UniProtKB/Swiss-Prot annotation:
Glycans are attached at residues 280, 422. This is Beta-glucosidase 7. Its main location: secreted. Hydrolyzes p-nitrophenyl beta-D-glucoside, p-nitrophenyl beta-D-mannoside, p-nitrophenyl beta-D-galactoside, p-nitrophenyl beta-D-xyloside, p-nitrophenyl beta-D-fucoside, p-nitrophenyl beta-L-arabinoside, oligosaccharides, pyridoxine beta-D-glucoside and the cyanogenic glucosides amygdalin, prunasin and dhurrin. Possesses pyridoxine transglucosylation activity. Residues 1-26 form the signal peptide. Disulfide bonds join 223-226. A beta-D-glucoside binds at residues 57, 158, 203-204, 343, 414, 461, 468-469, 477. The gene is BGLU7. InterPro entries: Glyco_hydro_1 (IPR001360), Glycoside_hydrolase_SF (IPR017853). The active site is at residues 204, 414. Changing residue 207 to V: Increases KM for substrate about 5-fold. Increases kcat/Km values 9 to 24-fold depending on the substrate.
Amino acid sequence: MAARRANCALVLVLALALLAARDAGAAAVPKPNWLGGLSRAAFPKRFVFGTATSAYQVEGMAASGGRGPSIWDAFAHTPGNVAGNQNGDVATDQYHRYKEDVNLMKSLNFDAYRFSISWSRIFPDGEGRVNQEGVAYYNNLINYLLQKGITPYVNLYHYDLPLALEKKYGGWLNAKMADLFTEYADFCFKTFGNRVKHWFTFNEPRIVALLGYDQGTNPPKRCTKCAAGGNSATEPYIVAHNFLLSHAAAVARYRTKYQAAQQGKVGIVLDFNWYEALSNSTEDQAAAQRARDFHIGWYLDPLINGHYPQIMQDLVKDRLPKFTPEQARLVKGSADYIGINQYTASYMKGQQLMQQTPTSYSADWQVTYVFAKNGKPIGPQANSNWLYIVPWGMYGCVNYIKQKYGNPTVVITENGMDQPANLSRDQYLRDTTRVHFYRSYLTQLKKAIDEGANVAGYFAWSLLDNFEWLSGYTSKFGIVYVDFNTLERHPKASAYWFRDMLKH
C-alpha cells in the first residue's frame, strides 16, 4: 500500500508539474542559447529595464470612475474605425488589476514601469474640475509600484486628448494647447512629483501629426480628402509645432517650479524607424538622410539645436511654422533625456528633388520605401504590415542620435513585435519568435552602448496584450498573454526570457 500511495503521489506531482509547464508555456520551450550571451551585468551598472503600456490601451473603466471621454473613446465607438468595432472600454482592466500586474513585473525582475496618465481621468473636461477618484487611482498605482521596488516612468500624454478640448478649441491645431497642457502637467508634477522622478510629456507626437492630420486614419481624422476637413500639406506641421511649444512650456514650468525640490527629469518620447539607403548612389543616400530629417529631425533638431532641419525649411518653405527667438530659446535644450520607440527599418530609394505642388507631409519627403534588396527582404514581417524585424535598425538609430546630436541621454521607451489574433493559447505562450526578436534587438543595442552611446534604459512593449489602436485586439504585443474573455494573465516565453536574463 505504501508503495502504491508513493506511486500515486509521484503521478500526482508529475501531473501538476506538467500542467504548470503547459500554463507557463516557457517551461516546455527548447532553450538552446536561451539568453544569447545577454545578462543584466552586460549592460551599464545603473541601466534600467522595464515594460511599458498606455492608459487607454490597458486601464479600462473608460466611462467610469469620473473619467471624461477622450478623442479615442469617440473614435473607437464610431463603427468602422477599429477592427471588429472594438474599443478600450474594458481593455485589460488594469484599473482594477494593477496590483496583479505590478506583482507580475516584480516576478519577472523588471526595474521600472512606463505608463501614461489619462488626461481626462484627471480633468474630465481637460481643464477646470479635478476628478479626485482618478487622482486616487494613480496615487495607488504609484505607491504600489514603489512598495514593490519598481520605479514609475510617467508619460503625460499618449494619443488620448480629452474630447472636450478637441470640441472646444480644435485640439492640437490651436496654439492655446500649450497653456492647457502646461496646467495639466503642473497638476501632475505637484500631485505625483514627490514620488515620480522620471517624466515624459508626449508619446510619439509625430505619429499624431501623421495619422491624425496627414493620412486621416486616426483621431481627429483630418486630412485633405477627409470628411472632417483638413489640409495634409499644412496641418501636420502646425500640430507638430504646437506639440513642441507645449512640451517646452511644460518643461519650463517643471524646471522653475518643481525640479529643485523634486529632483526629477522630464523628457519626450519620439518614434524612430531606421532608414538605410538602398544603394550607394547619391540619390539613395540623400533620400535616407532626408527621411531621417523629416522623421526624427522634425523634433530632435528643434529640441537640440533650436530650429527645424534645413532640408525641411528648403522643401516645406512657408508651410513650416517658424519659432520666434524666445520660442527657440525655450524649445532648445528642453528635454533632459530623449525617449525613442524603435521597432523597424526600411530601405530608401531616392529621386532628383523638385519643387512640387504641396500635397502632404508624407509627399514632402520625396522618397520611395523599399523592403527588399537584391531580392532579399530587409527582414521577416511580424503581424503588423509595417513591422519588419530588423535588429540592426536599433543600432542604426541609437548610433545616429549619438553622432548627429551630441550623444544625448536616450531611453528606449518601446521595442517589441506583435502576434496575430488567430493563434491558440499554447502558440501565444510559446512566442519563440518574440524571444529571438528581443535577444537580437538587445544585442544590437548593447553594441551601440559598448561603442559609447549614452543609453540609460530599455522598456519592452508591451507588458500585456492590449487594445492596439486601429487593430483593436487583433494584434498581440504583450509578453504576457491576456485572455480577453476572463482577463486572466499568463506570462509568455518572452516574459520568462526577461526574467532569466535579468537575474544576473
